[in-house]
């Protein structure tokens, strides 16, 4: 069981002052409102004329209404002072609020990390499947020579184009050109290697 906190003398005096202001303002509002209700009551004939009595009651109502407004403004100022007092002096509550906010942010961070890890694993699995599909498909091979992925898809699109399907000789010509370029590159490499050895 937590022991009640002991406030310093200055803070204790300040709280007592706040309490006194609260009681005085509430009493002022109640008393002035009661007097306004009494003033609104029509009395019997007195020595003062009715017109004079009406003016006097009217002035009294204005004064008491102003007192009620002043007491209300004082209460609003008291609320502001209490908020400031709590913000500046209630360190346990402030620390508790900070700890609660930190816990909420940590929970949110953990959820985001879990989602990112799950997304990373899914992307890795999909990428692995795409690589397996690419290297095991025929479009990834060209006469025993592996092609880059972009070139393989480009050639696959070329095979499926209407021009290639309508003109087989064009496809054969492209294949022969590719083989010729491969052979020329191989001869060039062999020739350069022979010259270096000599």
From Swiss-Prot:
Q: Name one Pfam family in it.
A: Med22
Does Transcription regulation show up as a keyword for this record? yes
Concerning InterPro entries, the annotation shows: Med22 (IPR009332)
Q: Which domain of life is it from?
A: Eukaryota
Query: What's a single GO MF annotation on this record?
Result: transcription coregulator activity
Report the GO terms under cellular component: mediator complex
An example of a Gene Ontology BP annotation on this entry?
regulation of transcription by RNA polymerase II
Keyword tags: Activator, Nucleus, Transcription, Transcription regulation
What are the boundaries of the region Disordered? 159-198
> Any idea where this protein resides?
Nucleus
What PANTHER family does this protein's entry cite? MEDIATOR OF RNA POLYMERASE II TRANSCRIPTION SUBUNIT 22
Q: What is annotated about its quaternary structure and interactions? A: Component of the Mediator complex.
What family, per the record?
Answer: Belongs to the Mediator complex subunit 22 family.
Functionally, this protein is described as follows: Component of the Mediator complex, a coactivator involved in the regulated transcription of nearly all RNA polymerase II-dependent genes. Mediator functions as a bridge to convey information from gene-specific regulatory proteins to the basal RNA polymerase II transcription machinery. Mediator is recruited to promoters by direct interactions with regulatory proteins and serves as a scaffold for the assembly of a functional preinitiation complex with RNA polymerase II and the general transcription factors.
Q: Protein name, please?
A: Mediator of RNA polymerase II transcription subunit 22
Name the source organism: Danio rerio
Could you read off the lineage of the organism from its UniProt record? Eukaryota, Metazoa, Chordata, Craniata, Vertebrata
């Amino acid at each position: 069981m937590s022991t009640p906190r002991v406030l310093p003398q200055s803070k204790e005096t300040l709280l007592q002052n706040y309490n006194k202001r609260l009681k005085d303002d509430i009493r002022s509002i109640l008393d002035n409102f009661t007097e306004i209700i009494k003033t609104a009551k029509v009395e019997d004939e007195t020595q003062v004329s009715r017109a004079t009595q009406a003016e006097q009651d009217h002035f009294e109502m204005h004064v008491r209404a102003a007192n009620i407004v002043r007491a209300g403004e004082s209460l609003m100022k008291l609320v502001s002072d209490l908020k400031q007092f709590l913000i500046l002096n209630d360190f346990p509550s402030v620390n508790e609020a900070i700890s609660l906010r930190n816990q909420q942010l940590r929970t949110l961070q953990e959820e985001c990390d879990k989602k990112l890890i799950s997304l990373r694993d899914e992307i890795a699995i999909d990428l692995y499947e795409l690589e397996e599909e690419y290297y095991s498909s025929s479009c990834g091979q060209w006469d025993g020579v592996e092609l880059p992925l972009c070139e393989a898809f480009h050639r696959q699109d070329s095979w499926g184009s209407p021009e290639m399907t309508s003109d087989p000789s064009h496809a054969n010509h492209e294949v022969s050109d590719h083989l010729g370029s491969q052979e020329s590159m191989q001869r060039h490499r062999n020739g350069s290697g022979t010259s270096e050895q000599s």
